[in-house]
Structure formats: C-alpha cells, structure tokens
C-alpha cells in the first residue's frame, strides 16, 4: 500500500521496453516501483527471510509450507503498550476554537487548545459530574473547557474552575479532587500531537526522559511534508502488516497507477527527469508473467527486538518503530547507518540531492478500529505542494485506501477465527516478498502475545459488526470531517453547486420574463445554452462531491 499511497504525491517515471523501445508516463505522479522492492544482503548479524518455494522433489515429500528462518536478539522482554507515546492527530487538522474528541488505545480523549498556556492539552473526555463527554463542549470566553451539560469549567491542568450550581457562600466544592479531570502528558513533535497514556502525576514530566520517535526528515525545513489522516475500519495489526507488504500493490491497487503493458521481457529503468529521486538504482530485468506485473521480491531484515526492526531494500531502508511508526526511506536512520556498508561516492551524491521517505503512523483505536496518519516528505518538487491544495492529493490517497479496504476488513475476521497467535500456521508464506510482514507478526506474537493490550476495556475476540458497504467505505466521517483541507473544499464545492443551480434557474427565469422584443434570438440562445451548461455543471459537481468526499466503491472484478 505504501507505494500506491505515495503515488498521488510523487512525480512521474518512465518504463522502457527493450524490444521495441517505448516510453509511457503515468497520469498521476507515482513511484517507479513499490518502495519495498527488495534485495537480500548475505552478511548480517540478524536475518529474517521467508524461504523460497520448495523444489518439485521436495514438494512431493511434504505438503507443509516451508518455515521462515529467524535469529532473535537474546534477552528480549514483553512490550509495554502503556509505556510509549501515541500520536493523536496532526495539528494542521485541529481547530483551536473547539475541543476535539479522539479515541486512542481505547481511551476517550478530548484535545483542545489552551490559549492561556498557549499549548495543546490532552485530557480524559469525561466530565466528573455526570460523565458527559467534554469533547461535545466549548471553550468559553476565559479560555476554559466548558462541559455544556451543566456548565462546569476546567483549566488546562484539569482543575475545576467553576460549578455554576454551587452557592457562592457555600463550601468551595470546585476545588475538591473529585471535581478534577485527568490530564495526560502531551507534546507536539513533527507537527503531530502525541500523548502518554497514563495520567498518574509521576508521569507529568515523562517528556524529559522519554520522547516520541524522532524522524529526521520531518524536522528538516528543506523537505515538504503534507499530512493526511483517516479512521480505518479494521484493526491495528492488519493495518501495519498491509503497509509493509509491497507485493499486493500491483494487484489490490491495480488501475490506480497506469502501468504500461509490455510484452515479453522488459526493463524497468529509473529516469532522472521529473524530480525522480531514484537515479542511483540499478536497472532491473524482469519477465512479465501477468497483466498486473507482479515479480519476485526480496528483503533483508535486521535486529528484531521489542522496539521493532529495520530492513534493507533495493530502493532504500525501512524501519518499524514500535508500536506506531513505519518508515521507508532512501536513507537509514542515523543510529542505523553503521549496520550497512557506506554507499559509493556517486550514490551518496545522488542521495544527497534527492531524498524521499514514506512515513505511516498506525494508531490502535479499539478492536477492529485504527487510525492512519501519513506523510511523504521529500526534498525535491517542493513547489508542487505549495501550489496544489492538500485535498487534491487526498483524492487519490483515499482511493488507494478504499481499494483494499474490504479485503482487509474481511481478512481481519478470518485471522480472528483462526487465532492471531496462529497467523503463521494459518497462512501459507512461501516467498520472500512477505519477509517484512512475517517479521512484524513475529514481533506482535513474541512481545505482545498477538494482541494489543486493551487492559480489559474490550473483549479482544469480538469485532464490530460489518456495516453495509456504503457505510464501510464512508469517507466523510472517516476523513473529511477530520481533515481541515478536505472539509473546507467540501464546504466550498457544495456552495458552488448551489450557485450553479441557482444560476441555471435564474437564467431561464430571465428569458421567461423578458419579452421577445427585448432580447434578440442570439441572446436568447446564448442564455439558454448557459443555463443548460450551468445545470449540467451542477449535476457533474454533485457527482464529484459524492464520489470524492462521501463514497467511492472499488470493484476489482471490473478493473
């Protein structure tokens, strides 16, 4: 999925056939190949590789799938889900004038801007009075968070500052501990709000000793980094493994990137035009075996521990920083550079000029629910993001998410039927293209017993019922309402639709009111044509709004 999502944010490439020579460019900016097109390095102190399919002789002797090989770091310990920072939302999609309700790790949160302290606050989304959600409240004229059920007001420290029903000459009940709201440690890093899921006062200054994952390119001013977010109707583990899987891209997302259809053997060659960052990669020779163009992929995974793992691929490097961050980049993280041989001088020069990363932040919400924040920072073609509004990129990126959404929603239920801890036994994994996915599942099984620790809030073996397809693929409540750019575009385009409808009716009305002697035949025809065009434009715009911001199905059988 990562290659496909990035396709809507990256410039074009060219794919050349050996016989005959031809060129073909994509209609949408796209990656040349999946960012996880991988190569295997032989020397490694830690390796995870999925074994190749058995030979014919071996296949006749056994029907069991080959077991992946792995070497694990000694002294591993269990992953503590409540001793880590979790992202909540990009600040570009939060309105400072209103409180926002979000759920992370099964915890109901209210996120709001405290203008008195000039910072974002993350608090328990529960009023201590009658347990009403504070996210349905407002920020009053004094900058306090007000519960609109009975008017109780709270400051950024969670202290109750006003109980309107308490007599002024009575005891100061608003100062009682029971009147306070739990406040979670929070910080803004990489223009994203993060919170620590423990409101115990001893964690108040946890940021001094434990910080959220640091991603260098998100702090580099030479990189562009437009963000997007969407609520996903399947769970955290399925979301993460899908983003790590390069082999599904040409199939599950077929038709979203228009690849050429060469016959026989062809060369995938990376052009240095159109701001392409991959000029240092070798030319690949592959044989086309089907319409979609799938091919063998390899990967080399290093250092699996409870903090995650990292890997080397053909186009660059990948990191899973547990529990939320998956990063693919042309460069390794600084602390991992010693794990790989230094690139050649020419390669290093190319990388220093054009650098690209794909950042996916996967947030556990509740069983069967997750949230994805994505950004594709790059230091080339920066002007494109300054010209094109963010919502335009989100059109294609949401279509990518929709195209395999139903597959993953159903897959999650089948995994649960067989038991998440039995994933490797239930799935037949004979090729190396699944190495990243296998490694993530091993991390999930080994360090977390194949489940998110919900601390008893949910039954981990129960998932929400599958809704009707139009509700499952809903874009408005899962994305538009949570994206400031798409929400604004939706509002303005709806207004434009109404204007076009009014204009078409008004022009017909003008023709009816004015006498024939007042308006020439040419003018009458012109007004009539304008009215028809205006009405047609309003109907087209209505369809565009619905398909872009509400519901866009994806039928693989007819693509």
UniProtKB/Swiss-Prot annotation:
Keywords: 2Fe-2S, Chloroplast, Iron, Iron-sulfur, Membrane, Metal-binding, Oxidoreductase, Plastid, Plastid inner membrane, Protein transport, Transit peptide, Transmembrane, Transmembrane helix, Transport
Keyword Protein biosynthesis: no
Main location: plastid
Recorded catalytic activity of this chain's protein: protochlorophyllide a + 4 reduced [2Fe-2S]-[ferredoxin] + 2 O2 + 5 H(+) = protochlorophyllide b + 4 oxidized [2Fe-2S]-[ferredoxin] + 3 H2O
InterPro entries: Cholesterol_7-desaturase (IPR050584), PaO (IPR013626), Rieske_2Fe-2S (IPR017941), Rieske_2Fe-2S_sf (IPR036922)
GO molecular function, one term: 2 iron, 2 sulfur cluster binding
Cofactor(s) it depends on: [2Fe-2S] cluster
Regulation: Down-regulated by light.
Reported function: Part of a translocon most abundantly expressed in etiolated plants and involved in the protochlorophyllide-dependent import of the precursor NADPH:protochlorophyllide oxidoreductase A (pPORA).
Protein name (database record): Protochlorophyllide-dependent translocon component 52, chloroplastic
Origin organism lineage: Eukaryota, Viridiplantae, Streptophyta, Embryophyta, Tracheophyta
Gene: PTC52
């Amino acid at each position: 999925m990562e290659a496909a999502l990035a396709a809507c944010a990256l410039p074009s490439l060219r794919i050349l056939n050996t016989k005959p020579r031809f060129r073909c460019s994509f209609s949408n900016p796209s990656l040349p190949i999946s960012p996880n097109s991988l190569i295997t390095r032989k020397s490694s102190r830690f390796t995870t590789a999925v074994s190749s399919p058995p030979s014919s002789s071996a296949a006749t002797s056994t029907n069991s799938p080959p077991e992946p090989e792995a070497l694990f770091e000694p002294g591993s310990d269990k992953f503590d889900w409540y001793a880590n920072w979790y992202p909540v939302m990009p600040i570009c999609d939060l309105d400072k004038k209103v409180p926002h309700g979000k759920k992370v790790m099964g915890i109901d949160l209210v996120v709001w801007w405290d203008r008195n302290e000039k910072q974002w606050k993350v608090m328990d989304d529960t009023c201590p009075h009658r347990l009403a959600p504070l996210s349905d409240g407002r920020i009053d004229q004094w900058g306090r968070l007000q519960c609109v059920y009975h008017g109780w007001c709270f400051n950024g420290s969670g202290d109750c500052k006003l109980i309107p029903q308490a007599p002024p000459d009575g005891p100061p009940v608003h100062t009682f501990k029971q009147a306070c709201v739990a406040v979670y440690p929070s910080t803004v890093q990489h223009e994203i709000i993060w919170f620590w899921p423990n409101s115990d006062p001893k964690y108040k200054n946890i940021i001094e000793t434990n910080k959220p994952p640091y991603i260098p390119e998100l702090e580099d001013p030479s990189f562009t980094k437009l963000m997007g977010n969407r609520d996903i109707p399947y769970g955290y583990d399925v979301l993460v493994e899908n983003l790590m899987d390069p082999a599904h891209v040409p199939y599950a997302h077929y038709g979203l990137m228009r690849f050429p259809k060469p016959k026989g053997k062809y060369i995938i060659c990376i052009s240095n035009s159109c701001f392409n960052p991959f000029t240092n990669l070798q030319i690949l020779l592959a044989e086309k075996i089907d319409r979609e163009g799938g091919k063998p992929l390899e990967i080399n995974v290093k250092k699996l521990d409870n903090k995650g793992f990292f890997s080397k691929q053909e186009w660059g490097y990948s990191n899973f920083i547990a529990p939320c961050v998956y990063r693919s980049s042309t460069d390794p993280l600084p602390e991992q550079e010693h794990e790989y041989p230094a690139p050649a001088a020419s390669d290093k020069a190319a990388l220093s000029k054009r650098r690209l990363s794909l950042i996916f932040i996967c947030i556990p919400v509740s069983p069967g629910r997750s949230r994805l924040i994505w950004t594709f920072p790059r230091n080339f073609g920066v002007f494109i993001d300054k010209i094109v509004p963010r919502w335009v990129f989100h059109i294609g990126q949401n279509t990518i998410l929709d195209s395999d959404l139903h597959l993953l929603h159903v897959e999650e239920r089948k995994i649960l039927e067989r038991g998440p801890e039995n994933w490797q036994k239930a799935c037949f994994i004979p090729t190396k293209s699944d190495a990243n996915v296998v490694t993530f599942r091993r991390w999930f099984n080994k360090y977390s017993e194949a489940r998110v620790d919900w601390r008893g809030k949910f039954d981990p073996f129960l998932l929400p019922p599958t809704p009707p397809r139009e509700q499952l693929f809903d874009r408005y409540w899962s994305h538009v309402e949570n994206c400031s750019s798409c929400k604004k575009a939706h509002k303005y385009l709806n207004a434009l639709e109404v204007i076009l409808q009014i204009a078409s009716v008004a022009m017909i009305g003008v023709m009816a009111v004015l006498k024939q002697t007042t308006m020439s035949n040419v003018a009458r025809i012109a007004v009539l044509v304008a009215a028809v065009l205006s009405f047609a434009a309003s109907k087209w715009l209505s369809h565009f709004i619905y398909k872009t911001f509400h519901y866009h199905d994806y039928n693989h059988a007819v693509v």
